[in-house]
A protein has these predicted regions:
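Generic cytosolic/nucleocytoplasmic N-terminal low-complexity/intrinsically disordered segments
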Residues: 1-2, 33
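Sec-dependent signal peptide recognition
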Residues: 2-9
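C-terminal motif of bacterial Sec signal peptides marking the signal peptidase cleavage site
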Residues: 13-14
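Short, low-complexity, disordered segments immediately C-terminal to signal peptides
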Residues: 19-33
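Carbohydrate-active enzymes and regulators
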Residues: 34-343
């Protein structure tokens, strides 16, 4: 007789912090969910990989541009490449959690929405105002240093950005290009037409910017359909999160905070809206079904926040399983926090 354990690994594509390709995901949870006895001598370990893809809902300015670029650039650097990588290995299975707020924004970008960084990239470098230049210099180095290091011209501009008043129009045009190239997965940079732009390296033209942004649009357009297709074939499972990425137990009842933390300071005015909490679950599933063609049967509660009181809400909507962190499991089982082999 042997024990066969299921190891559940959740990997996060960071919400907004710039990261290199190597740092794009981080193993944050390794929780033994279940043990079962089978007739073998050697132990087996079943590994479940779950990628949690999320961006907060970014606001738009008065001109209708998203104030942050992170949905777009994570789509071009991470979201599409990760699911295509799974597709390259047909025998591999994985789970992707796509939050409703991320899906809404991806759909918006596919329908023509733009962010401020896109807006400042489109402006012809020959007519940039001082305000435009200040934004570009202050924000277009929002990239992991390891990624910047792959582009010699990017390094050159970073090292001289304290003297940007001496920059030429070409310097600004190159920076407009390099920020967006850096936030494109190497897989796509190795393919035409982006391969030629990478080889060029500097002295970019306004036409080059059009080519690059057009490729970004194409990549974004593929993110949702590619996930939907792999889900349809059964190679991946897609889960989602309650609609607005809420801390669901606190919507149900703020007093539930004291269950996980006896010393928690509760608000003076207790808040309890169980129907709102249930609506969050329902609307999240509705949006996922609308955009992906199927209704998920698994869910990742936002921040892994769960309570006994909200579990029934998931079950009522047809959810068969949810995921959370090992700290929740250890408290539920009344055992010490799991320890790691630090060697």
């Amino acid at each position: 007789m042997k024990k066969s354990s299921i190891l559940f690994i959740v990997l996060f594509a960071f919400c907004s912090q710039p990261s290199s390709v190597d740092d794009a995901v981080d193993v944050t949870t390794t929780t033994v969910l279940n043990e079962m006895i089978i007739d073998e001598e050697e132990p087996e370990l079943y590994v479940m990989l779950m990628w949690h893809q999320h961006q907060p809902f970014y606001t738009k300015n008065d001109d209708g541009y998203y104030t942050r670029p992170w949905v777009r650039v994570h789509a071009t650097k991470d979201y599409l490449d990760m699911v295509e990588l799974v597709a390259d290995y047909p025998e591999m299975k994985a789970t992707f959690n796509l939050t409703p707020v991320l899906l809404r924004q991806l759909e918006d970008f596919s329908n023509g929405a733009k962010d401020l960084y896109w807006y400042y990239t489109e402006i012809n470098a020959d007519i940039l105002t001082q305000e435009d230049k200040d934004f570009i210099v202050s924000r277009f180095f929002d990239t992991n240093p390891k990624v910047i290091a792959r582009f010699s011209r990017y390094v050159e501009l970073r090292n001289s950005n304290q003297d940007s008043s001496l920059w030429t129009n070409q310097d600004f045009r190159d920076l407009q290009m390099l920020f967006n190239l850096a936030w494109t997965d190497p897989k796509y940079l190795a393919q035409e037409p982006l391969k030629s732009l990478v080889s060029k390296g500097r002295d970019f033209t306004e036409d080059d910017k059009f080519v690059l942004l057009n490729e970004h649009s194409k990549l974004i357009d593929k993110v949702i359909p590619t996930h939907a297709e792999l889900w349809k074939t059964g190679q991946i499972e897609i889960t989602t999160t309650p609609y607005a990425h809420p801390i669901l137990p606190l919507i149900f009842d703020t007093n539930l905070a004291s269950v996980g933390d006896i010393g928690a300071e509760l608000p003076k005015n207790r808040f309890s809206k169980p129907t709102d909490a249930a609506t969050q679950v329902e609307k999240g599933l509705d949006l996922a079904e609308q955009l992906l063609g199927q209704r998920p049967t698994g869910m990742w509660p936002a921040e892994g926040a769960v309570s006994q009181e909200v579990l029934g809400m998931f079950a009522k909507e047809g959810i068969k399983w949810i995921a959370t962190g090992e700290h929740v499991l250890s408290k539920s089982l009344d055992i010490p926090t799991f320890k790691r082999n630090t060697k």
